[in-house]
């Protein structure tokens, strides 16, 4: 793989982590000694007009030189790229890498002035819990809509029971098993919705005012948040801003009284036999109409709004995951998406000065991540989908493959890296590092099933999850090897009574990798530099001011002999995987392999 000049948004290359408008930042570029050029310039935009400024060499070794330039942030978002010119040829260095032709500015590096992020986020690993399936503290009487299931029965996938099978997991059950989460090493919990509803997933909220009594109600919530706080575990909630359930008190009032303010919260349309617009044309999920200022006030703008209430010290959330974020405020000729997104961010910042706002958007809209809205996204399209396709054994997964109505294609390592680079290049570095990375969730097949039950490939998945920039999220039960062929099937329970069914070797590896993610400086705040990409392997560096890590991820048997001496590195310590020393990485294995080493 050709090595050329490198720059990214991490601390090695940008002098200020959270600069303010009008400040100067120093940009640095690392250039290998073998790379030849006559002049290096930075092109940046000032009030929409491009300007050029020459870089100066600041240091040089046998292996590389460093070049730098100061840049004043005159606009809220500053886009820039570097030009390396020589006789009759040139190359641009943008967030997409090196190119020898002109390209659009949407792949420029970006710095967002006066943007803030939670102080605790960078060193966090989250554990996703689907409340009905994690742990049950006691038996409860079920409502009429629910179909009771025994704890260790498998979900009936895609059937008339979809959404109404109830296993009885609750918040006291979570509290009683916080030891498991803490021992795993996770310091954050992301809950799918906890509000009253008429489904097991609770994305059809009947109220945003209290916790579902089936989960133990507000009292169980307070017990859980207090216990989690004592352990240093933060909790992120899940909110539907695009729709509510047909039993939501706002919707019931709107139906019963045409003069009610709530009437304007929804779209009424006689083209549907039920008389209103539902999300995906589902009558169970009335879509919210953000033309209503009163809806905005109740949901996020008002002092006692839903968003603000649950972020208060009393209710204890440290952030929100926003469901179907790309659709909220958008309906035919209406497009209030940006207003809603910015309003939610303003409400979050006003009510909690250190909270995380992450959006579900399977199609990844880059403009949503410009510092005014979401801190990050659930990185489905820029991480999960290309990586899962690369790792997949083409098993027949239900419902297509994460938005693609086809079986998983076969791609090589270069296609994988090109895919994830396309998406990371379209957003600021700090939006990437504040995004949630995941190898599965409650809406996807389990990763263990994607790789046909192969433990070594599963381990490659968790190793990449813990070493790629972003905030890792582990779907409950992944750590013990749970499987599932679809989103519904993946929502399996954890058998707490019979641990002989757990993959204990995998669990220990999870713990080791989570610990590395939370303690190694280069994984917390380092940049990303690709060294070698093959059909079946990825080799890359994560580098901070204090540490350099080498990471190997393979999906199959590999034979690799890679010389580090040309870059001036040698092995210092093996942190995970096969032991290495000297200046050559030598790996010859008959299965998928992972390795993490510190270099000096």
PLM regions: where:
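Glycan-association/targeting regions that enable binding to alpha-glucans and other polysaccharides
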Residues: 1-127
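Hydrophobic faces of well-ordered beta-strands that scaffold small-molecule active sites
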Residues: 125-127, 189-191, 235-237, 320, ...
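Carbohydrate-binding surface patches
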Residues: 16, 26-28, 531-567
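Active-site-proximal helices and loops of the catalytic beta/alpha 8
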Residues: 40, 225-234, 242-264, 272, ...
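Substrate-binding/active-site clefts of carbohydrate-active enzymes
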Residues: 126, 130-187, 194-315, 340, ...
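C-terminal beta-strand-rich structural cap/linker in extracellular carbohydrate-active enzymes
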Residues: 31-33, 78, 125, 581-600
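Active-site groove signature of glycoside hydrolases
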Residues: 304-331, 437-441
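Aromatic/acidic polysaccharide-binding cleft in carbohydrate-active enzymes
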Residues: 132, 370-372, 376-381, 433-455, ...
């Amino acid at each position: 793989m050709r090595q050329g000049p490198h720059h990214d948004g991490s601390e090695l290359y940008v002098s200020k982590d959270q600069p303010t408008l009008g400040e100067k930042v120093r940009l640095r570029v690392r250039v290998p000694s073998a790379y030849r050029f006559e002049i290096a310039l930075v092109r940046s935009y000032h009030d929409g007009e491009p300007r050029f400024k020459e870089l100066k060499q600041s240091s040089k070794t046998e292996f590389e030189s460093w070049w730098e330039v100061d840049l004043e942030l005159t606009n809220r978002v500053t886009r820039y790229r570097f030009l390396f010119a020589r006789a009759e040829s040139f190359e641009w260095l943008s967030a997409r890498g090196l190119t020898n032709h002109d390209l659009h500015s949407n792949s420029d590096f970006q710095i967002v002035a006066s943007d803030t992020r939670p102080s605790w986020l960078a060193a966090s690993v989250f554990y996703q819990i689907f409340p009905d399936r994690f742990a049950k503290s006691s038996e409860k009487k079920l409502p009429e809509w629910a179909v009771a299931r025994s704890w260790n029965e498998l979900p009936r996938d895609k059937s008339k029971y979809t959404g109404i099978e109830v296993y009885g997991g609750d918040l006291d059950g979570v509290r009683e098993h916080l030891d498991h989460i803490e021992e795993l090493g996770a310091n954050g919990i992301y809950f799918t919705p906890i509000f009253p509803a008429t489904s097991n997933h609770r994305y059809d909220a009947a109220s945003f005012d209290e916790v579902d009594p089936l989960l133990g109600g507000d009292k169980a919530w307070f017990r859980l948040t207090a216990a989690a706080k004592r352990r240093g575990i933060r909790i992120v909630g899940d909110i539907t801003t695009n729709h509510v359930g047909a039993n939501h008190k706002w919707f019931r009032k709107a139906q019963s009284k045409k003069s009610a303010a709530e009437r304007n919260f929804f779209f009424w349309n006689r083209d549907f036999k039920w008389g209103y617009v539902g999300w995906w044309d589902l009558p169970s999920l009335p879509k919210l109409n953000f033309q209503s200022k009163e809806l905005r006030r109740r949901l996020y703008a008002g002092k006692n709004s839903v968003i603000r209430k649950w972020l208060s010290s009393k209710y204890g959330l440290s952030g929100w995951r926003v469901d179907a974020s790309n659709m909220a405020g958008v309906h035919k000729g209406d497009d209030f998406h940006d207003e809603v997104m910015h309003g939610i961010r303003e409400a979050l910042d006003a009510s909690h000065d250190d909270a995380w706002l992450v959006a579900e958007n399977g199609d990844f809209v880059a403009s949503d991540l410009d510092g005014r809205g979401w801190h990050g996204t659930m990185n489905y399209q820029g991480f999960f989908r290309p990586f899962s396709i690369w790792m997949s054994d083409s098993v027949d997964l239900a419902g297509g493959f994460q938005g693609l109505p086809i079986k998983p294609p076969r791609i090589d390592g270069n296609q994988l890296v090109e895919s994830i680079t396309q998406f990371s290049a379209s957003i600021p570095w700090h939006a990437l590092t504040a995004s949630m990375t995941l190898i599965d969730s409650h809406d996807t097949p389990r990763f263990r099933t994607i790789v046909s039950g192969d433990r070594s490939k599963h381990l490659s998945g968790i190793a990449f999850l813990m070493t790629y920039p972003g905030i890792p999220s582990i779907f409950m039960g992944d750590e013990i090897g749970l499987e599932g062929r679809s989103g519904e099937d993946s929502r399996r329970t954890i058998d707490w009574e019979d641990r002989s069914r757990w993959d204990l070797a995998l669990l220990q590896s999870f713990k080791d990798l989570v610990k590395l993610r939370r303690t190694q400086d280069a994984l917390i705040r380092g940049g990303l530099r690709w060294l070698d990409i093959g059909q079946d392997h990825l080799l890359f560096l994560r580098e901070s001011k204090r540490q350099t890590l080498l990471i190997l991820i393979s999906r199959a048997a590999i034979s690799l002999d890679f010389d580090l001496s040309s870059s001036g590195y040698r092995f210092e310590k093996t942190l995970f995987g096969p032991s290495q020393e000297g200046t050559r990485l030598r790996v010859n294995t008959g299965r998928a392999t992972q390795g993490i080493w510190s270099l000096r």
